[in-house]
C-alpha cells in the first residue's frame, strides 16, 4: 500500500546470532536415513506453468526451465507427504522443509522409532529434541506478549524448523532478551539473532492487478473469491477498512471492503460490482497469466512467486511458516516469511507456488533492486475467516463448513488435514470419490458435500 508513513527505506543487513540458552537434545542426533522410497510424481501439468512463472524462477532462483518444472513438481509432492506425516506423527512431529536443487523433503520427529515411517512415506528423516507443538507454544506466548504491548526493536519472530529453535530477530541482544523476559518463555528454546530489518506494510478480477482505495492509495488484488452469489477478491487488511471503496486497474468503480483486520492479522476481502468477473488467474505481467487450481500450502524451502502492481512478477523461497512480524502499526501473527522482494503498492498481491494459491502480500523490508524479505498472509485462514470460496480452474474451493456438523463418523479413508492431489480416490460413507482438484481437506469439506472437489465414482 502506498502511503507516506510506509515510504521509509528499510535497512537490510546480515544477522549475527546470539544464543540465549543451549538446546538440550537429550542424546538425540539427526538420523542419516537411506534414500526415501520413490513415489509417483504429482499431477502438475506442463500447461499449468506459465512462461512468466518459469522465467521468474529462472531469473530469481538461477534455475533452467527443466529444473524449474522439476522443482515445482517435487515441491507439490512434498507438501502432500508432509501434511500426511504431520497428521500421523501427531505430537512427535517437529516440522518439514525442502532443500537442494531437487527440493528434497526432510521431516523431523522427536521419536527415533518413527524414522522408518518417514522414509517409507518418501521423505528423509531427522530426529530432533523438541516437537513443533512445543515451539508453537513458545511462539504463542511471544505473540500474546506482543498483543499486550508491541516490543521495541524486535521486528520478527518465528519457529525455525531446520534449527529446531524459536528465533527472535532483534536490533540488539538486550532488546531480544527483554522481550523474552516479558513473555516469560523458556530461554533455552530460543535464539536471539541481531537484525537491522525494519518491516513495513507494502502498500476481469485478476491476482496482482492494481486497485485504488477511495481514489488515493494503491494496492494489489490477491485472489478472486466468491461468497454465495457475491463476487470479490482477497487482499491485505492494511489496504483498507470496512466501507473503503475501490476503483479497479482501469480506474472504474469496482467494489467495497466487506471485511478487514489489521493489525493482529492482515486480511481483507472486497465485494465487487456486477461489472467485474472473477477469474482463476494471476497476472504474469507480459509473460502469460498463471492459472489458480487450488490452495495446498507449501512447506519451508519451497519456491514461491509473487505478483504485484508495482514490481510485477518475482520469485524466491519460503523461509518460515507461522511468523510474527512487528510493523509501525502493530504486530501481525501467522504470516509466512519469504526471500521474495516487494515494494509499496505490491501489498495484497498474490503469492503462488505452481498452480496453488499461497497467500497475499503483507509487508517486508528492502526492495527489488537490492533484494529483501517479505511476509504474506496465508490464503486458507483468510478464506475461512470470511467464509469465502477461492475461484479456481476447477470451479472453486469451498470454505464454509456445515452449520451443524455430523455427530457420527460415516467411515472411510477420507480425513481432515490430508493433502489430496487431483485424481486421488477415497472412500466416504460407503462410496468412492475421485479428487477433482488439489487441496488440503478441512472440517466440513466432506466428499459428499463438496462436488467442486470430489466426484462420486
UniProtKB/Swiss-Prot annotation:
Residues of the active site: 238, 266, 347
Enzyme class: hydrolase
SUPFAM superfamilies cross-referenced by the UniProt entry: Carbohydrate binding domain, Trypsin-like serine proteases
Underlying gene: sprC
Catalytic, as annotated region: 203-393
Keyword Hydrolase in record: yes
Name of the protein in question: Streptogrisin-C
Keywords: Disulfide bond, Hydrolase, Protease, Serine protease, Signal, Zymogen
PROSITE patterns in the record: TAT, TRYPSIN_SER
Every Chitin-binding type-3 domain range: 415-457
Propeptide, residue positions: 35-202
Cellular compartments per GO CC: extracellular region
